Amino acid sequence: MDIQETINQMGKKAAAAARAMRAASPSAKTSALLSLAQLIRQENKAITEANARDLAAAADRGLDAPRMDRLRLTDAVIEEMARACEFVAGLPDPIGATEKQWQRPNGLLVGKMRIPLGVISMIYESRPNVTVDSGILCLKAGNAVILRGGSEAFHSNMMLASLIHRALILAGLPQDAVQVVPSTDRGAIKALCELEEYIDVIIPRGGETLIRTVVADARMPVLKHYKGVCHAYVDEGADLEQACEIIFNAKVQRPGVCNALEGLLVHRSEAHTLLPAVAQKLGDAGVSFRACPRALPLLAPHGVPMAETDPGTEFHDLVMVVKVVDSQDEAQDYIAQHGSNHTEIICTRNHQNAMRFVREVDASMVAVNASSRFNDGGQLGLGAEIGISTSKLHSYGPMGVEELTTTKFVVLGNGQIRQ
């Protein structure tokens, strides 16, 4: 069977599973999630062995360090997946909830009820834990999902998919509610993008090339998890010791992820004090700086002149743009030009400046005196996320269970007809 036919058959199965999932009870979904948590812990060794095969093959192909980091499933990451299953199991079930209700003059009772999106396709790279996060969120929201992970994580993804299927069967739910494309053929991406007959929405999560390819080819709505070009602006009068800690965490903790810091904007009044401290603390951790002329001498010996192409670049590495600005206006203009609507930070003691930044800066998360690393479904209390949407429709920011649902109108009458 060629890849086109394989994807078509998966679409048919997913559509049938989505119909069954609309009738699934909250208790059945909870049972599946708790069973999956138990299976993940029980099968730690098998998961690690499958992941080791992927890591060895990736190393042979010369996969870069940030992608190797995202590919690796440590004991801590495996336990985190199990805990995510348990957390999502404990979340309120959104399906069937009536959000608004009002009565018309003719006696009609009108309401909006939350329902599943239907069939979702998720296309992603490197991170095998996304297989579990996506599967459990779609399951909790009553959807069916077709997952196409990166070829570098193939064995890990198939192992995790087998555990999800076992959990679904144990709970009496259709195992086709979560399917993983059983092939590394890149033609699967195009085939999924063309399957509008069965797929209601497609979510790409990965590099810029993948996102642009899916947006160009998809015949159904796309929820984009676009690149993360995140900035911190350090305001005049900010707590500089606190700001330095925030900048360090946001850049150094995991430089290859989408909520890592890529640019630092410093008010001119604070540059001579803050930037030497940043150079020492982050420089000692291996960070190099692409700096504007005013920042460069303050970052010695870790800085180089900023190139024209550096602003707006997602480095995925221990590299950061640094610019001295004359005002908050200049900082916000820079962010508007070079940001990616992902995450933006202001470090400030000035409440008025903070609220202005929150109100005017266009990003899926704006943080005041906190790290960009908090733009994450688990960190924000969603349990897990299927991605961080940088689109405003249908969701903006981390997409948890509720973001994978929509609403329909429900009208209750007693014989009314339109006059």
Curated annotation (Swiss-Prot):
Its main location: cytoplasm. It catalyses: L-glutamate 5-semialdehyde + phosphate + NADP(+) = L-glutamyl 5-phosphate + NADPH + H(+). InterPro entries: Ald_DH/histidinol_DH, Ald_DH_C, Ald_DH_N, Aldehyde_DH_dom, Glu-5-SA_DH, GPR_dom. One of its GO terms (cellular component) is cytoplasm. One of its GO terms (biological process) is L-proline biosynthetic process. One of its GO terms (molecular function) is NADP binding. Pathway: Amino-acid biosynthesis; L-proline biosynthesis; L-glutamate 5-semialdehyde from L-glutamate: step 2/2. Keywords: Amino-acid biosynthesis, Cytoplasm, NADP, Oxidoreductase, Proline biosynthesis. Pfam families: Aldedh. It is found in: Cytoplasm. CDD domains: ALDH_F18-19_ProA-GPR. Its EC number is 1.2.1.41. HAMAP family: ProA. Catalyzes the NADPH-dependent reduction of L-glutamate 5-phosphate into L-glutamate 5-semialdehyde and phosphate. The product spontaneously undergoes cyclization to form 1-pyrroline-5-carboxylate. Belongs to the gamma-glutamyl phosphate reductase family. This is Gamma-glutamyl phosphate reductase. It comes from Oleidesulfovibrio alaskensis (strain ATCC BAA-1058 / DSM 17464 / G20).
